[in-house]
Amino acid sequence: MARGKKMVDRVSELMSQPKFIRNIGIVAHIDHGKTTLSDNLLSGAGMISEELAGRQLFMDSDAEEQARGITIDASNVSMVHEYEGQEYLINMIDTPGHVDFGGDVTRAMRAVDGAVVVVDAVEGTMPQTETVLRQALKEQVVPVLFINKVDRLINELKVDEMEMQVRLAKVIDKVNKLIKGMNEDMYNNGWKLDAAKGTVAFGSALYNWAVSAPFMQKSGVSFKDVYNKCREGDMKSLAKSSPLHAVLLDMVVKHLPDPFDAQKRRINVIWHGDKESVEGKSMLTADPNGPIAMMVTDISFDPHAGEVATGRLFSGTLRRGTELYIIGSAMKANRVQQVGIFMGPTRVEVEELPAGNIAAVTGLKDAIVGSTVTNLREMVPFEALTHYSEPVMTVAVEAKNMKDLPKLVEVLRQVAKEDPTLVITINEETGEHLISGMGELHLEIITGRIKRDKGVEIVTSEPIVVYRETATRKAGPIEGKSPNRHNRFYVELEPLDQVIVDLIRNGEVSMNQTWIERRDILVANGWEKDEAKNIKDISTTNIFIDMTKGVQYLNETMELILEGLHEALQGGPLADEPVQNMKIRLVDVKLHEDAIHRGPAQVIPAVRSAVKAGILYAGDSLLEPIQKISITVPTDQMGNATSQIQGRRGSVLDITSEGDTITVVGRVPVAELFGFSGDIRSATEGRAMWNTEFAGFEIVPNSLVKDVVIAIRKRKGLKEQMPRPEDYLA
């Protein structure tokens, strides 16, 4: 423990000096070596023993992670590295690479300022490499590159020294192409990766060595030495002369920004408040004496301390006993109980923690992932976290023993707090609890944790695909009457243009903006000024516009109208699935002058039925989730790979060859991917490597809609026939 204690003292000293802090994330495609890399960095910093590094999986502290050999949650750790005689504090987050856990990457990118992108030298860039890189650039996180498993190139693929350098250059080129394609301005302003400048390192995380151009000049180690040592299997002397932690952390300190530099640039992107306000100026300068401004990026449960909220502190200083507010919640003061930092799975308490650091705080009981935490009564919240994937699969869970039901409800509430990419719903009529997640593995892990960590025995259904509903044409005006017939609401509906859907998904159009800012963006994208300035609500990718003129009592009724709208959009008329990509206009309203006759029981059902009937009139159709799939096989197995895609209602988008392997890229509906792993293995004699990524929703073919709708309605206990608009307009 003495080693840990000494480390905490060094960390505490550096915390208050932002120019000596680096907040970094380790990101990559699954199995490219992030966690092994993280462990060896920790070993170099003297936090775990050298013998255990790479096998201990210190960062994978969860039993499920160790058993599966993958990272599921993002893990935080703080350590100290010495560069040119000065100590630096490195706050590092190791993130998952499996596509099902992409939400953890999204959240980690908000907390950090720089990212080490890890790419396997043999496999090269993969779909998840692209996704994590896009997320980093969106959050203004500066990347550096580590090409891992270089020893495999030499010992498995038997390439010569020249070929090795050509292959490594290809990987750098591919990553640069991705950066340029995603944001040319950043690429031209110094974000281009360049081995000569030292923003790229090569090595083997498993064997604990790495080289970079600056380090080779300093140490006299050449590519020839690297090649020869790998051929001879003498990795130990490489690890001695070019230790991984020294090369990589030198690169991190030299090329990734400190919180001062990063926040000057990042705050403009992740916070839309007034930059001249007290909190605005304080965040731009990472001022420890300013108001507290923290963004929660993770919630975990400690059996002794309860909920632990981890997040980036952009301004102010956290101390025990401080009263903080969670913006957007009931505005009750939450008293900080403990302030700490993470050393892998262990949370270590500190006296105080200033701006520019990643904090672990207990006592913030109202916080959820994405919360803005401050000591101000009012503050513009941080930009919401946007995930590139959406839930595509659902399982129903029930408690094995009825006595465990209250415990299950509490556990599901905790699980939803810990992982905001999950959607938990309770069907009041059937009493079933539904968990929707990013894929089969995601749901398997979550249900496994409920049993193992939370001690609740549960029974789960087979996974079901998540569908969405949308309109395909214009409809309206449709009249919705209140039950007492004294209030009438008229709505028009049409599909929302894809350009606007993308702007909402990317956070460029939201209700957090000023109405002028939002109006200008929409007008620039082809909207009428009148519509653009009268938006009353944006929920998921649906926009609600008030186009009425001079209706008495409308303002005081608007909250109820929005409640009716949200109820209609949460479960559409066709199959009670969420509605998306709709533009809904309120064009006229007739309200009773007496408030008692236009209460919730009158307004909410009237609006709900008008919207649901309108969606049916507007050609309601189902959307199904699609996944992009990449299959890499030997050349002679190409036919088997393509037939696996085409036989599942899929289409082949691209076929590329490299050496004696071929990569087939296609799109396949998630509904057709059940059992895929077994089928592709047997079809290709176990010689296929594949991965998937979320590719949005597409309309279900007409010939299948009726069968799918009836099956969903049957499962949900609804009438087993196709609904009609008249059903909602009694």
UniProtKB/Swiss-Prot annotation:
Record-linked InterPro entries: EFG_II (IPR041095), EFG_III/V (IPR035647), EFG_V-like (IPR000640), EFTu-like_2 (IPR004161), G_TR_CS (IPR031157), P-loop_NTPase (IPR027417), Ribosomal_Su5_D2-typ_SF (IPR020568), Ribsml_uS5_D2-typ_fold_subgr (IPR014721)
A molecular-function term among this protein's GO annotations: GTP binding
Location of the protein in the cell: Cytoplasm
Protein name in UniProt: Elongation factor 2
Stored SMART domains: EFG_C (SM00838), EFG_IV (SM00889)
Functional description taken from the UniProt entry: Catalyzes the GTP-dependent ribosomal translocation step during translation elongation. During this step, the ribosome changes from the pre-translocational (PRE) to the post-translocational (POST) state as the newly formed A-site-bound peptidyl-tRNA and P-site-bound deacylated tRNA move to the P and E sites, respectively. Catalyzes the coordinated movement of the two tRNA molecules, the mRNA and conformational changes in the ribosome.
Modified residue annotations for Diphthamide: 597
Keywords assigned by UniProt, alphabetized: Cytoplasm, Elongation factor, GTP-binding, Nucleotide-binding, Protein biosynthesis
Cited PANTHER family: ELONGATION FACTOR-LIKE GTPASE 1 (PTHR42908:SF3), TRANSLATION ELONGATION FACTOR-RELATED (PTHR42908)
